[in-house]
Amino acid sequence: MALGPSPYYGVSFFQFFSVFFSRLFSGSLFTGSLYIDDIQIIVFLAISCSGAFAGTFLVLRKMAMYANAVSHTVLFGLVCVCLFTHQLTTLSLGTLTLAAMATAMLTGFLIYFIRNTFKVSEESSTALVFSLLFSLSLVLLVFMTKNAHIGTELVLGNADSLTKEDIFPVTIVILANAVITIFAFRSLVCSSFDSVFASSLGIPIRLVDYLIIFQLSACLVGAFKAVGVLMALAFLIIPSLIAKVIAKSIRSLMAWSLVFSIGTAFLAPASSRAILSAYDLGLSTSGISVVFLTMMYIVVKFISYFRGYFSKNFEKISEKSSQY
């Protein structure tokens, strides 16, 4: 990462894009030094795109609450691996992903076990499991690191601490998710709508479930190492929820998810830098991204509602006029 004066220093919201794209098209991003704003854009783009690939099928399967639970409980698996290996920062991406997958399956088992044993609703058992495992992981993590504030950084992230080394893990994650989505697209779609029919076609349902858990776990691990759990969960669920309002097919659902994710990946760092330049106030970039995604969802929902309202009224007026 570059140590000299940043070209992004003191820029406004629109100047941020001018600086970034001028560096992109001039080749400075590939041949020159990378600044923290460049790294934020690259990492956010990778996380947002990988989240759109996995989130599309999570939303189709109505697994948003499960993804919310796993996004918190996955920390328990990562902490346990660190305890057993006595390593905190040198673990490989593969090891962390396997730990995350194991925790994701443990979370699903505990939710199922509590729901059926104690006869409570699935929402209640989900809340109990992720609250328990997440609190245990924070206690163990504070015990390991002697840092009482590390839980805040894991939830909100710390985009200002990103380095060039954070680019490689999220790049591997997006490539893995893209390959799985492309080659298993038909199986993922079919099993998401009708698992019985998919099984009759010879599609290995259990393997498809494991692939989705792998995608979810890989996204969360990449985000934990970069920007925290809040932004990961936002990019996993909200873009697909927005796209679901306007999409007419699965491919368009995924395409719109990518559009909203990529747009937020650019808007959040630009807004964070603009606020810092104008008011000397440093805000959480991941928090800003969640605000943008929520605003997009509200706007798209309102537009969809009013478009449906006016189209219905227009049809009624047309029917009445045709009668005369």
UniProtKB/Swiss-Prot annotation:
Could you state one GO biological process linked to this protein? Answer: transmembrane transport
Q: What topology does it adopt in the membrane? A: Multi-pass membrane protein
Keywords on record: Cell inner membrane, Cell membrane, Membrane, Transmembrane, Transmembrane helix, Transport
Write out the transmembrane intervals: 1-21, 39-59, 64-84, 94-114, 125-145, 165-185, 201-221, 226-246, 252-272, 286-306
| InterPro entries for this protein | ABC_BtuC-like (IPR037294), ABC_TroCD (IPR001626)
One Pfam family, short name: ABC-3
Query: Where does the record place it?
Result: Cell inner membrane
The answer to keyword Transmembrane helix applying to this record is yes
The cross-references to SUPFAM superfamilies, in alphabetical order and at most eight, read: ABC transporter involved in vitamin B12 uptake, BtuC
Q: Which cysteines are joined by disulfide bonds?
A: none
Per the record's keyword annotation, is Transmembrane helix included, yes or no? yes
Please provide, in alphabetical order, the Gene Ontology terms of the cellular component aspect for this entry.
ATP-binding cassette (ABC) transporter complex
The record's function comment reads: Part of an ATP-driven transport system CPn_0346/CPn_0347/CPn_0348/CPn_0349 for a metal.
Membership in a protein family: Belongs to the ABC-3 integral membrane protein family.
The protein's name: Probable metal transport system membrane protein CPn_0346/CP_0414/CPj0346/CpB0353
Annotated source species: Chlamydia pneumoniae (Chlamydophila pneumoniae)
